[in-house]
């Protein structure tokens, strides 16, 4: 009993009407449930159980009507296929070669009427507008059309009653399919009555369809003329004179009448006051329009959504709102900068025009102009072009190889002048002489220091001699006490000794203060140390790659991480079974210290606590094979760093380790270390 989708669509309007009569209101849920029952091929009992929660006591009556309609549609579909051809032929004989009916059917677009529409009590008619338009048909005109059609059918029926059985007509090429006449080539009275009723019903439906089309066209003023022509053609076909309806000119405004004093008056002369529209804020107008739009959305939900199976009318649809835009003020001096930029651009264009004009006069063209010329077409690999792209500017009209003596006019920009391009300095100055530092011996350094001190002493003596500065106090020591002071030392030796020792302490203090002033502070020493460790890597980064068989000892991990941080090295440590790769990046001095750490300072062959028990059980040969060690895989330079701060990465699989290196653009480090590990294991 399952129906196709097309049959379910035709059955849907009838089910909606039946549900509305049974429940008193339309319910899309019941309609959908009924269509599902019919579509799945349920019997009456299952369908009643399925629809009982929705219809309660009216379930059985509704199910009986539903299945009767399905059976009726199925029987009408089988009978329609058998009687379709004979009915078409008989209708043609009843109406003859009446061209008027064919015109009517061609002028109006036919509407397919479902077979379940006969069950409806009242046919649906599209309501027209309240005011009649010139292209619409009134009820009186439709009634006249019906009477004319009935009159024609009665006359044709009377003619058929006196006509003898017609002779078989030859087949015309206009007929698409040959149709056979009934036996005896005669029409029975009951059959003629059936044909007449069908024709009357079709004429009535055609008139209703035309009236609905006229009503729809009347709502569109731009299509009034076409609608009026269709209506007039149908009225002439039915033998009815169409009424003349004048089109009122509603587009013109009401004329303005002014009296002698200039006041606005109506037709009777009474003074009237016109409504003056006051300006309103744009924000208020937008707010009113927004509220009206929200109200319309609430009142009129879309029909497409209601017809959807999954539409829930309880859920409200929030309309999309435009975001508010804030004020954007121009910065001070913005337009002044734009004007200055335009003036500069104009001056530059003027200067370029003068330069190009001078170049045209002299015939000198820069090589950059030729370099900017691109080839006109792309050549495949291995193809030889007819002319090179740098020559295409000189020969714009092409190049003919058959011509023996080409004309001078064929070339562009060829003159007798010789162009001397301007000489440019190379980007890197390689002519600077490299001077090697001169290293002096200890004896030479002392001699140079004495000479410098002697020159400084002579300068002080000259200043004292000229009176620019007071003479310095004699530098008295215990050893030269008697020679410097002389008689004063003999008179009071204790006092002189105290004076000499005070001078010695004073000189010592000044010396220590000078040293303390030159001494760096703690912060300066720290910066100096960091600067010493952080080497210049602008010319390239030195990289070293190490491979360690076992790196499970946390003490060794800490040493690697701590020393890399102290030496300001970057890199990564990838932990994998039997292949632990350590990559470090930095300056040459730091790399030298880290290399000594990895290859000499750390004792890799020391047994760890967690593996000592296992090693005792293994044989000596296996212990030798699995001895832990560190190998320098590769060292070189690169342009930039690939890694950041030193970190440890645990990679259980080889693919995961390679992907980690590939993410930093250094997968070749892993490939090199892994290949060496494989070769070492095979030996």
Swiss-Prot record:
Chain positions with Phosphothreonine modification: 167
Start-end of Basic and acidic residues biased regions: 73-107
Subcellular locations according to the entry: Nucleus; Nucleus speckle
One Pfam family matching this protein: PWI
Keyword presence, Ubl conjugation: yes
PROSITE patterns the UniProt entry points to: PWI
Origin: domain of life: Eukaryota
Region Mediates interaction with SART3: start-end pairs: 416-550
GO CC annotation: nuclear speck; nucleus; spliceosomal complex; U4/U6 x U5 tri-snRNP complex
Entry keyword Kinase: no
Start and end residues of each stretch annotated as Disordered: 73-135, 153-183
Post-translational modification: Ubiquitinated. Undergoes 'Lys-63'-linked polyubiquitination by PRPF19 and deubiquitination by USP4. 'Lys-63'-linked ubiquitination increases the affinity for PRPF8 and may regulate the assembly of the U4/U6-U5 tri-snRNP complex.
Keywords, ordered alphabetically: Isopeptide bond, mRNA processing, mRNA splicing, Nucleus, Phosphoprotein, Spliceosome, Ubl conjugation
GO BP field: mRNA splicing, via spliceosome; spliceosomal tri-snRNP complex assembly
Entry-annotated residues carrying Phosphoserine: 164, 619
InterPro entries: Pre-mRNA_splic_Prp3_dom (IPR013881), Prp3 (IPR027104), Prp3_C (IPR010541), PWI_dom (IPR002483), PWI_dom_sf (IPR036483)
UniProt subunit comment: Component of the precatalytic spliceosome (spliceosome B complex). Component of the U4/U6-U5 tri-snRNP complex, a building block of the precatalytic spliceosome (spliceosome B complex). The U4/U6-U5 tri-snRNP complex is composed of the U4, U6 and U5 snRNAs and at least PRPF3, PRPF4, PRPF6, PRPF8, PRPF31, SNRNP200, TXNL4A, SNRNP40, SNRPB, SNRPD1, SNRPD2, SNRPD3, SNRPE, SNRPF, SNRPG, DDX23, CD2BP2, PPIH, SNU13, EFTUD2, SART1 and USP39, plus LSM2, LSM3, LSM4, LSM5, LSM6, LSM7 and LSM8. Interacts directly with PRPF4.
Function according to Swiss-Prot or TrEMBL: Plays a role in pre-mRNA splicing as component of the U4/U6-U5 tri-snRNP complex that is involved in spliceosome assembly, and as component of the precatalytic spliceosome (spliceosome B complex).
PANTHER family: U4/U6-ASSOCIATED RNA SPLICING FACTOR-RELATED, U4_U6 SMALL NUCLEAR RIBONUCLEOPROTEIN PRP3
Protein name: U4/U6 small nuclear ribonucleoprotein Prp3
